[in-house]
Amino acid sequence: MNTSSRITYFIIGGSRGIGFNLVKILSASTGNTVITSIRGSPSLPKNKQVEDLAKIRKNIHIVQLDLTKDESIGNIADEIKKTPFFLGIDIFIACSAVSDSYYKVLETPKSVWLNHYSTNALGPILALQKVYPLLLLKKTRKIFFISSVAGSINAFVPLSVSAYGQSKAALNYAVKTLSFELKPEGFTVVAFHPGMVSTDMGQYGLDHFKEKNIDISGVNIITPEESASALIDVFRKILPEDNGKFFNYDGSEGVF
C-alpha cells in the first residue's frame, strides 16, 4: 500500500450529524484516510453508525476523545499515532459541538455557559494543541473549524442562543488568531457555518423556536448529509489566501 500520497483527515465528532456524514463522504474515496473521534463507549447507540461503517471501510479509524476531560485530550495524539500506517494529519476538522442554550442572557445558568464554552471553544483548541505536531508531519496543513453564524457579531442573528453564540464567537476569535500565528508555517485556518441543519441538536432548536412562536419561516433547513456534502465542496476549494476567513456552507464568504 502506498501511504505517502494519501490524504489523512482527523475529524473531531464523527459519530453522528454533520461529523458522521463528513466521515461517510470522505471515506468513500480510497485515497483518503479518515481518523475520527467518538465520545464514550463504542457500544453506545450514538456511536453505532460510525462503528458499523468502520467495519466495512478499513480507511476509517476511530479514537476516543472527550473535549471536557483533560486526560482524554492529553491522550489524543498518542491514540492517533497508534492508527494503522499513520504518517501525519493533512486536514484537521473540529465538528463536535453542543447547543442547548435557548435562555436569555440574564437567565442562563453558569453551568450552561461553562459547558458550551468548554465543548465548543476551549475543547477544540486544546485538542489542536496536542495534535499540532502531527499536522507538521505533512505539508497540507489545513485546520477547519465548524463554527456558526450564531457566533457572528457583524451578522448578528436576533435569537436568544446565549451560551452557544458566545462559545462560537470565542471559537471564531481563536480562528483569526491562529490564522496569523500559524501562517509562517504554511497553515491555512478557516471557520465554516454549516447552515441550519436538521441534526438532533438542530431539530431541538427548531422545535424550541416553534414552541415560542418565533418566526423562522425564512430559514433554509438542510439535512446533515446536504451540509456535509456542501462543506466538502468548499473544503476542496480552500486556498492559502483564504487563511483566516469565515465561509458559509454554500461557498459564500461570511463575516465575523
UniProtKB/Swiss-Prot annotation:
Keywords: Cytoplasm, NADP, Oxidoreductase. One of its GO terms (biological process) is cellular detoxification of aldehyde. GO terms for cellular component: cytoplasm. Its main location: cytoplasm. Coiled coil: none annotated. It is found in: Cytoplasm. InterPro entries: NAD(P)-bd_dom_sf, SDR_enzymes, SDR_fam. Gene3D superfamilies: NAD(P)-binding Rossmann-like Domain. The active site is at Y164 (proton donor), K168 (lowers pka of active site tyr). NADP(+) binds at I18, S37, K46, D66, Y164, K168, V197, T199. One of its GO terms (molecular function) is aldehyde dehydrogenase (NAD+) activity. Pfam families: adh_short (PF00106). It comes from the Eukaryota. Belongs to the short-chain dehydrogenases/reductases (SDR) family. This is Uncharacterized oxidoreductase YKL071W. It comes from Saccharomyces cerevisiae (strain ATCC 204508 / S288c) (Baker's yeast).
